[in-house]
């Protein structure tokens, strides 16, 4: 049920630790098995990449990570093991490709690869940027999961910042155009006819 209610946005690689931490919570605190927890996690997280510069794709020393977060490291290690099985199925006997697509490689943990292996959606912030991700930076991940990649210009979600956070405005909008706008933003264009309506403007203010 959780993926029907919540999407967690990994906005660049900085919040990536949320992925294995949610696995830990679901398994250790809620008693779920790996497969059930993984099915939830891989339908909750979405990843936005902001730059094609490799310097911005975070990686962390394995020894430090394992020392500070031993349980989370165990989960990341299992994520990587399962990823390696998948990579060998998709790109058999290509050890060089497996190495740079791995979550754990050369005694480092690669956060972008963790996102690519875990998120149901991956987007660049423009069509050109996304084309570069698909054709160059993340090309082999794109070939493996091409239905995960999108070009989306960043913005806010009106469902959270209007529908959830501003019930008065939500009620006003819905009273004029119905509730379909909550699922379809294009419906908001119906408000144009009220732009010069004194009563509506007074309520809006």
Role assignments for model-derived ranges:
Residues 1-205:
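Catalytic cores of carbohydrate-active enzymes across secretory and cytosolic contexts
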